[in-house]
A protein has these predicted regions:
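Mature-chain termini and adjacent capping regions
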Residues: 1-12, 18-312
Length: 312
């Protein structure tokens, strides 16, 4: 096994925000800062909904790269290749892949910048509390965009799981993560389905990144222990537990079916409110409607009392 160890060197003022929000932020604080060309370059880490700050003093931590089949430095192509059960470790963050690639550029002042990072094969991005799985990961550092794709992409945290058939993206400057293609978010027995899920984060009073809102687009479906609700779009307030659904809303509970233009579902308390369509210039809006089927108690069948047997 080849081991490659180096220390990154920062060439610009460190960022003070906790920028590593979701889905594999492969540390811009490390790679935008460059590396010592004599020792090579490497990979940083990722974190999902973690308060990891790669822009502070942790930027001086060494990055260690391991590869069973060796590490290749292609100077003409300005890229480092790590092959064979490759992994990159920095602090509590590890990137695994069959192959890891770090693309760099040379600046006029002689410094170097890593501008793109790729991972291929059995990609796994692991932090202390989260693990993301896919077959391909690309982080474009200049744009602040990371894309994890390949098969059924999956992200697992202590409380949640997120799946997507197409890809999961992280937009660093927007503090936003997007899951595309038959996306699914699972927490305990609650499930949120949609073609696209967009998750938004912000820093709480403790300085940690916290998920506060999820937007769901197209073929939205929320499933709980008692209800199944479908709509065209939904906005879920994570802190209050309230989901607001709009467009062709349908709520099913047992044999009861309710329909309307919008609905408010409190996922914490199990309370649902359905609303009719507002009136327009063309006329009155559509009313909310429903079919309720009350449960009836099943009557116990009375068994006939057997009389004495008559002997013939």
């Amino acid at each position: 096994m080849t081991i490659f160890r180096f220390i990154t060197r920062r060439l610009f003022r460190p960022r003070t925000e906790a920028r590593s929000l979701v889905l594999g932020l492969w540390t811009a604080a490390v790679f935008s800062g460059g590396f010592s060309i004599g020792f090579g370059g490497g990979f940083g880490g990722v974190a999902f909904a973690q308060s990891l700050n790669f822009g502070g003093g942790a930027s001086d931590l060494p990055i260690e790269i391991y590869a069973d089949d060796g590490i290749e430095w292609q100077q003409e192509n300005l890229v480092f290749l790590s092959r064979g059960n490759a992994r990159a470790v920095r602090g509590e963050v590890t990137v695994f892949g069959d192959e890891l690639r770090a693309y760099y550029r040379e600046n006029p002042d002689g410094s170097t910048d890593i501008w793109r990072l790729d991972a291929y094969g059995k990609v796994r991005i692991k932090t202390a509390q989260e693990t993301a799985y896919g077959k391909k990961a690309i982080y474009q550092i200049d744009k602040g965009v990371m894309v994890l794709s390949g098969g059924r992409v999956r992200l697992v945290t202590a409380t949640d799981e997120i799946f997507a058939d197409r890809q999961i993206e992280y937009w660093e400057n927007k503090w936003m993560a997007v899951a595309r293609g038959n996306a699914l978010a699972v927490r305990k027995k609650k499930r949120l389905h949609a073609d696209v899920l967009a998750a938004y984060f912000r820093v709480d009073k403790q300085g940690k990144n916290k998920l506060y809102r999820i937007d769901a687009f197209d073929r939205v479906k929320i499933v709980t222990d008692t209800d199944t609700v479908t709509s065209d779009r939904a906005v879920y307030n994570v802190e209050s537990g309230i989901a607001t659904l709009t467009g062709s809303v349908k709520l099913v509970r047992g044999k009861n079916v309710l329909r309307g233009c919008s609905a408010e579902i409190n996922l914490n308390e199990g309370v649902s409110k359905l609303y009719s369509c507002p009136a327009t210039a063309a006329g009155a809006g559509k009313r909310a409607r429903g079919v309720l089927r009350p449960k009836r108690k099943e009557q116990k069948k009375v068994q006939p009392i057997a009389g004495p047997k008559v002997q013939k």
